[in-house]
């Protein structure tokens, strides 16, 4: 337990033995259905060389034979999960394909029984993935596209599992073999904003003034490799000039860390090294804490000789992929319970933990309710190197046009632990007792289904 005042695990959770005997209950799914709504963005959101203007919010409901009903949520990201699908279709068309995979998964679940959500995901992932290849006419469809489509289904399965087994805390819900991986209870988690291509430098400076101290910056801008590199060098120079001198008490060196996300846009290691040479020239190199997904996944470029912390995200589709990336020199993993399902995230996190590879939680521009699923993981991971706390990227407040209305859908919209203050989430006993509100139904999303 870390991060300032450590909260007692015993005060937050029931003993594991108190729920033993219920956790293997066979749950039969009587009904499954879904719906979605579109949430517009404030401005076009750019990464991977593309731009999206809205995010589909999907809700999946599972009902058991006992009459229990639970709704899981998903914020779809076609561009993130498979840029080739995004490029081959209209924005709505790509979203419709992913949603069709969610609907297909629900048809597979009707009449099916399960003991735990992890096994359930293992059973349906391959057929849903194969269905996705068929409807997208893309035999090279990225597996992350299928996982993204299954987030709402998986969340609903976890909530139904908890309901049927009388579990009301995140700690008790996590199976025993994963508890060591998520054994911390931080009282602070760093809140990381995202600076996409179109975010003005003025807004980046304002974010720092508001207390944010760990900055995620999208690199790999549109254009040829040469054009991309020049744009990224200029962007880095502008950002470093604006905030590079700012000090913080939250890091070991007192400087603001930069977290670059290239989303696989750098086709060669030499090109990335040119960007890092530029960073060195402007004295920004020592502030680069993480570079996420610099290279295309299919290039299989090793990264152990780059000399910085390189994180895998979308290339670590599964726990097996995470092992491969670690063997290639990747020394951090960006976890996304809100993009690859909680079930798969637990597997990936355990692999990383066993190999002493630090993890943090990255966003997918998800809804305020879904932020809590990511926060639940970030709050329990080992502290990130150089910090005495967990890391959680969240950027929905920067991008959703109707963000205030979306906050009202949260079961505890006014809870202090829901909000970022001075670049931090402060997580007290109330937060851990309520598990961020994930077990309490959201009236809005219930009504979307019913």
Predicted regions located by residue number:
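Metal- or metallocofactor-binding catalytic centers and their adjacent structured scaffolds
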Residues: 70-165
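Conserved, mostly hydrophobic/aromatic
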Residues: 60, 67, 153, 166, ...
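Short, Gly/Pro- and small/polar-rich lid/capping loops
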Residues: 14-61, 65
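N-terminal export signals
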Residues: 1-15
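Catalytic domains of carbohydrate-active enzymes, especially glycoside hydrolases
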Residues: 206-220
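Catalytic core of soluble alpha/beta enzymes
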Residues: 219-372
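Flexible C-terminal active-site loop/helix
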Residues: 365-450
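Active-site mouth loops of central-metabolism enzymes
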Residues: 185-202, 219-221, 267, 311
């Amino acid at each position: 337990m870390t991060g300032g005042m450590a909260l007692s695990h015993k005060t937050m959770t029931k003993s594991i033995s108190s729920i033993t005997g219920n956790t293997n209950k066979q749950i039969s799914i009587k009904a499954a259905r879904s719906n979605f709504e579109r949430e517009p963005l404030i401005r076009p959101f750019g990464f991977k060389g593309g731009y999206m203007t809205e995010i589909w919010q999907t809700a999946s409901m599972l009902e058991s034979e006992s009459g229990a009903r639970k709704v899981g949520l998903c914020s779809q990201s076609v561009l993130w999960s498979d840029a080739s699908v995004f490029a081959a279709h209209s924005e709505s068309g790509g979203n419709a394909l992913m949603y069709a995979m969610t609907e297909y998964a629900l048809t597979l679940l009707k009449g099916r029984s399960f003991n735990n959500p992890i096994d359930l995901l293992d059973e349906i992932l391959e057929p849903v993935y194969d269905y996705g290849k068929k409807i997208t006419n893309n035999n090279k469809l990225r597996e992350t596209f299928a996982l993204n489509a299954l987030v709402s289904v998986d969340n609903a399965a976890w909530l139904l599992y908890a309901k049927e087994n009388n579990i009301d805390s995140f700690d008790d819900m996590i199976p025993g073999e994963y508890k060591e991986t998520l054994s911390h209870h931080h009282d602070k988690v760093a809140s990381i904003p995202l600076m996409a291509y179109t975010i003005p430098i003025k807004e980046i400076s304002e974010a720092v003034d508001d207390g944010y101290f760990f900055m995620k910056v999208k690199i790999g801008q549109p254009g040829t490799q040469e054009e991309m590199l020049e744009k990224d060098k200029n962007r880095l120079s502008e950002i470093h000039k604006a905030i590079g001198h700012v000090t913080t008490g939250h890091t070991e060196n007192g400087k603001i860390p930069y977290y670059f996300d290239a989303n696989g846009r750098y086709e060669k290691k030499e090109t990335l090294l040119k960007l890092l040479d530029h960073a060195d020239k402007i004295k920004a190199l020592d502030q680069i804490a993480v570079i996420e997904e610099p290279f295309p996944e299919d290039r299989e470029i090793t990264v152990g000789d780059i000399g910085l912390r390189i994180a895998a995200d979308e290339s670590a589709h599964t726990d097996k992929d995470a092992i491969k990336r670690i063997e290639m020199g990747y020394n951090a993993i960006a976890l996304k319970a809100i993009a690859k399902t909680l079930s798969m995230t637990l597997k990936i996190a355990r692999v990383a933990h066993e190999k002493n590879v630090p993890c943090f939680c990255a966003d997918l521009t998800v809804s305020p309710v879904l932020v809590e699923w990511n926060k639940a993981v970030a709050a329990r991971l080992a502290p990130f190197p150089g910090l005495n706390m967990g890391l959680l990227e969240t950027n929905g407040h920067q991008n959703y046009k109707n963000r205030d209305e979306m906050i009202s859908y949260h079961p505890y919209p006014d809870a202090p632990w829901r909000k970022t203050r001075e670049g931090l989430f402060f997580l007290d006993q109330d937060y851990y007792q309520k598990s961020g509100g994930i077990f309490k139904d959201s009236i809005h999303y219930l009504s979307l289904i019913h």
